[in-house]
């Protein structure tokens, strides 16, 4: 019975609120005496920003550095030297030690639920050397289960 009373009181409150709002809104609106339905004399054309063409000389700052022509472009990104893991893949400088689509070498894609750690595709849920994330080893004698060392 209390639920029915609550439902009726909410319905009455809602009806009163709607009635008050519509009376206030209707009193403040003004009616235009003259409305022109003629076509505008000059059409206004707005350029679409999505399809706006860029100037020929303008360069995209996110564009690749065209490392196919000059592979040495990628070495400054990785710290240089022989320890650099940056490589030119598909005309882009890629860190092959941590990229899941180019793990260890170009176009070497890791399988589903694998992650690229140090250039190798590993299951971080069960690998003792990379438990839960890259370079997080479990202690001696512990197992990695579901990305946690000594789960049980």
Swiss-Prot record:
The keyword Cell wall biogenesis/degradation does not apply. Transmembrane segments: none annotated. Residues 1-19 form the signal peptide. Keywords: Signal. Belongs to the STIG1 family. PANTHER family: STIGMA-SPECIFIC STIG1-LIKE PROTEIN 1, STIGMA-SPECIFIC STIG1-LIKE PROTEIN 3. The lineage of its organism: Eukaryota, Viridiplantae, Streptophyta, Embryophyta, Tracheophyta. It holds the Pfam family Stig1. This is Stigma-specific STIG1-like protein 1.
């Amino acid at each position: 019975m209390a639920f029915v009373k609550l439902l009726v009181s909410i319905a009455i409150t809602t009806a009163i609120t709607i009635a008050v709002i519509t009376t206030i809104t209707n009193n403040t609106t003004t009616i235009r005496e003259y409305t022109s339905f003629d076509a505008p004399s000059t059409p206004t054309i707005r350029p679409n920003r999505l399809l706006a063409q860029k100037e020929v000389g303008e360069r995209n700052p996110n564009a690749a550095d065209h490392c196919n022509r000059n592979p040495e472009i990628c070495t400054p990104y990785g710290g240089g030297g022989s320890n650099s893991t940056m490589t030119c893949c598909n005309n882009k400088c890629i860190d092959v030690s941590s990229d899941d689509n180019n793990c260890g070498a170009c176009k070497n894609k890791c399988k589903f639920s694998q992650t690229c750690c140090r250039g190798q595709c590993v299951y971080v849920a069960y690998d003792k050397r990379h438990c839960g994330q890259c370079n997080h080893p479990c202690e001696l004698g512990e197992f990695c289960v579901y990305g946690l060392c000594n789960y049980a």
